[in-house]
């Protein structure tokens, strides 16, 4: 008997909930081409995978009575504050300083002033036409580097995967990926039909808690 395939949860971004789970049949054995030796190796790999997933299931905290509620109060939503990501120059500081002193710039930038026969760059170093603001130089670029666009954004919430603040109707993809790992359900048909978890059915509606065609 082969190891059961894990159930992989699906994220519903409009509602901010888990939209049910379905089995990952990509791990199933092709019985037409698999011999006894290959079948045994695949079964061992699947059993090892299930052991890892079951251990992960036990370690995932679920501080709520219902694993997948249809409405998420704000107290149950984890909203991490995005951290700033400094961008360091690709070359040593001496190399960047030498290029700046010789008037090197990319795609626009400010004017270069000539004083006493030397070239001095007296504007914020940037990679676009728009000013980034603030007295910058090659040594302070790591916190102000930008690529062809507007001014720096004060928040990186659009890239963090966290829900926009304030939000009280659903979770974000960051929280979903950590609280809904692939689930291994052993012996799914050992009990009566009403004991089978509805969220593992492909036509389960997590919002109304009903199964299409059955309820």
UniProtKB/Swiss-Prot annotation:
The keyword Magnesium does not apply. The modification Phosphothreonine is found at residue 62. Induction: Expressed in the late phase of the viral replicative cycle. Residues 110-150 form a propeptide. One of its GO terms (molecular function) is hexon binding. Keywords: Capsid protein, Host nucleus, Late protein, Phosphoprotein, Virion. Pfam families: Adeno_PVIII (PF01310). Cleaved by the viral protease during virion maturation. May cause the middle segment to be shed from the capsid. Coiled coil: none annotated. The record marks 109-110, 150-151 as: Cleavage. One of its GO terms (cellular component) is host cell nucleus. Interacts with the peripentonal hexons as well as the hexons in the facets. Part of a complex composed of the core-capsid bridging protein, the endosome lysis protein VI and the hexon-linking protein VIII; these interactions bridge the virus core to the capsid. All late proteins expressed from the major late promoter are produced by alternative splicing and alternative polyadenylation of the same gene giving rise to non-overlapping ORFs. A leader sequence is present in the N-terminus of all these mRNAs and is recognized by the viral shutoff protein to provide expression although conventional translation via ribosome scanning from the cap has been shut off in the host cell. Belongs to the adenoviridae hexon-linking protein family. This is Pre-hexon-linking protein VIII. It comes from Murine adenovirus A serotype 1.
């Amino acid at each position: 008997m082969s190891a059961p395939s894990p159930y992989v949860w699906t994220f519903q971004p409009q509602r901010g909930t888990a939209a049910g789970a379905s089995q990952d049949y990509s791990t199933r054995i092709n019985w037409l081409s698999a011999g006894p030796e290959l079948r045994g190796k695949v079964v061992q790999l699947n059993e090892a995978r299930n052991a890892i997933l079951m251990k992960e299931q036990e370690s995932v905290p679920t501080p709520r009575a219902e694993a997948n509620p249809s409405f998420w109060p704000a107290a149950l939503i984890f909203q991490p504050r995005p951290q700033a990501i400094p961008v360091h120059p690709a070359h040593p500081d001496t190399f960047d300083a030498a290029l700046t002193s010789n008037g090197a710039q990319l795609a626009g930038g400010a004017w270069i002033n000539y004083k006493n026969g030397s070239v001095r760059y007296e504007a914020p170093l940037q990679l676009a036409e728009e000013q980034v603001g603030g007295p910058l130089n090659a040594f302070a670029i790591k916190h102000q580097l930008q690529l062809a666009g507007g001014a720096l954004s004060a928040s990186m919430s659009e890239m963090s995967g966290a829900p926009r603040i304030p939000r009280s109707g659903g979770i974000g993809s960051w929280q979903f990926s950590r609280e809904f790992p692939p689930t291994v359900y052993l012996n799914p048909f050992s009990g009566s039909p009403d004991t089978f978890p509805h969220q593992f059915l492909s036509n389960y509606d997590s919002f109304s808690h009903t199964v299409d065609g059955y309820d």
